[in-house]
């Protein structure tokens, strides 16, 4: 949405306003995984000639549609089921991405479109002209849905409730259309009545207030009635049904928690903290939680760990934990806090359009960050900001940029705001999952930049203002035009900021929101003793992909002998050098304490520093107030001072990373001091362990004394009397617990002169395992033991093979034998006494793969494949799959690649399917620039089919398939495909002649859009035969020039550039002829399209078959057209409107006979 337009407020793309919707699901069958129900939408027309109503619906089989109790005809068409039609041999990704973006837009509710088009009965036209209310009643069913609703039905004895069978709604972005017909847009708000009839042993949890629960006469079923009086988008409606155990929150009675059977004790502990999160958000936003109740539901096989919907959130059951578990506690609390932040911004306040998504994700991420700062402290908060900043910088530099606010011009691809990507960013459903994750990360970082500019106080006032307006609007029961106040837009948000703070943040928005890219600084300095000036040089790289030029203020902090000083430099167009005056003279003779930034004064040993310079260390942009990467050069002693004495954790982490390049005794000492300092933040100490191991390896020839960290570990955690025996575990001090876990893992990375792990270190780790005693500890040690196995894996080095001997148990290296025995013992113990989240199994599987890769045990995926099967715990499956993916790459195994791809198609768990594609993309068996035996035509076809039609039920999965295809084959036609024959395809059903699409040269294909051939008047050029005009009337599209769904059968439309030597002609008498000029002569052959039409009519009369109509949502051959003659209104009325979009797979559904028309394609091959 453009800003200029945005100032007028919300303009609906639909010719009606939805005010209320009823969803009634009166039958759920867990055995068959099916759902039957109806919806009723209350619609107010906003234009007098409303005669079509477009709604969203995927997978639903629609039985009957009534408008105000009159039967209504409808057309169902979903161009996303099959993006490029199957006669196409197109295999380049550019083509697919354009076609996919077009298909998604063709049914995008934000453009007023939908898969379901309902014809308003002619009897109601007068009623509509008076703008009177319409009630649209739709009966539908779902049979084994592949997306939107996920059934979990354990295969065991007993009733469904005893088995713990449950079902829940899920999906990426607006995916409600997958389980009931609706307007699946975040900007169409209405009130809701939700009814679910379930078995008496089941509980249905949904949005809003539970009004009543009514049992049937035989007491075998009950109906849950929910009312949601706050106007809400269909995309924020959710459902969970299962034999849940129920816990009313003891601190807040309006909050209810639900979990699967026998997990109630874990639920009590996990949610005991939630009321504090509520209090925090209500306090900072000075606003009550917007709904009258809140429900948390913990389910198995979750789509994502946290999914927020209006007044309820669905969580993964794996987040539940007992009081004995340390590591999971902060992670789960963070998930709960994220979900609650999204209740305010995301569910209660919704977005006006996709280009405003960044505002909601930014605000919810920002207030979640404030909660984190209060709960875990400033150090943890700053560490998190640094981590997020590093992630977004790495991603943007790798892919070329993340754009928060894509403003779409005329909708042409040449205005494509992200031409560097292999997918369109104009719609959430075309985005790579990784891109969307990074998008959310960047959004909250930009909110923090806005806070730096206007202050936190004003920031919170803006949020409060947005919530107050929305709250007032939501209580306007009969003034639905007021509800748009509950939608946030970029322009509205910026207006609010300028009203509240009086500050102009336009330059900041222009820099970080309206354009993509991060800043890359390179800094170095010299001290001019004569002038007592620090000469700082700052260069920028703004030519690499993903970078942008920064002009503006930049803070530099200089720590001198007399204290710490902040300087703000103005980064101009060309300025590189900046002179900064120094405050201190170099005076090292006076013994005086040195003041630090936080007011502390410390004694320092200044013997290491440069005698002529008063500078201790320098930091560029210490507050991370620019999205940037800084590479700064200063001497090793300055990094050592910075590590020891700078109190900011980010500065300490930067110093540790820099010291890896300076392996000297002084660096070793600085790192050891940090490890011993108990006041130092535990994450910094953990990082120092790994840096110390790297330095020790670089200094291996000059290192003296015991291996790095060994004496420190012994002193901290071992018995005084017997230093090789570890004390009984006591994890009461969490900081030392994390250090105790990390040190052995880092020590195992030590190597001697022969590049082997020192025997002393290996024996030390084996002793830690042997003497580990957790009997007196009140906390579980499962994470600690898992890290000890990781340490064993880290100690493994490549095997030295003699005469290519085959590895057997008898000739195993004795050290490796010890490691393998421990791993086997751990794995067997796990079967008897499984650890929390099976952390031990996960570490063992990773260790076995390390042994395989290093040549100690035969490389074989069989063990991993057995652990990857459905039924194992999800973390175990992912660890096993990671090993199979790695094996596929290292051993170039086509068989395992096929096994993985079969799993992507058939595994019952959506998250696992998504993860396999993700792992293959990150660790691919080959890439577009390599020759590989795995790259063949069958694989190309298989992956093409997967992304083209095999993943239409899950947006995230389809985008994952696109990512993998891009990684393996790139944007153009895969190199392993044979060159196609030159050919012309005549498509009889389409009545179009098309060049064989496989032979478009890449230069053309790369710019190709699946655009309809249009003549000057914007009408599609279609060869039409009047005799079946009444069947399918061609009409131009309502969406801008390049209509998506229209006639998208022809893969290379006539509008595309033709090969040299081919001419398309239309004669005055409108006889269409196609001329083909052979390259070796000047003669032209003509094909008369009339002949084609005659044969088309002939085929039409002979191929009419009577068949049951295919179910909308089930993929079908693209040529099928299901016709239902309508008794109420003659079909010719369908052609009445000229703006209706006409798509590829048409189902004119009604309750009469069904005819199916088969498609024939005549191919004329021409050989030059």
From Swiss-Prot:
Molecular function as annotated in GO: chromatin binding; transcription cis-regulatory region binding
Keyword Nucleus: yes
Membrane spanning residue stretches: none
GO terms of biological process kind: transcription initiation at RNA polymerase II promoter
Subunit structure: Component of the TFIID basal transcription factor complex, composed of TATA-box-binding protein TBP, and a number of TBP-associated factors (TAFs).
Its job: The TFIID basal transcription factor complex plays a major role in the initiation of RNA polymerase II (Pol II)-dependent transcription. TFIID recognizes and binds promoters with or without a TATA box via its subunit TBP, a TATA-box-binding protein, and promotes assembly of the pre-initiation complex (PIC). The TFIID complex consists of TBP and TBP-associated factors (TAFs).
Protein name in the entry: Transcription initiation factor TFIID subunit 2
Species per Swiss-Prot/TrEMBL record: Gallus gallus
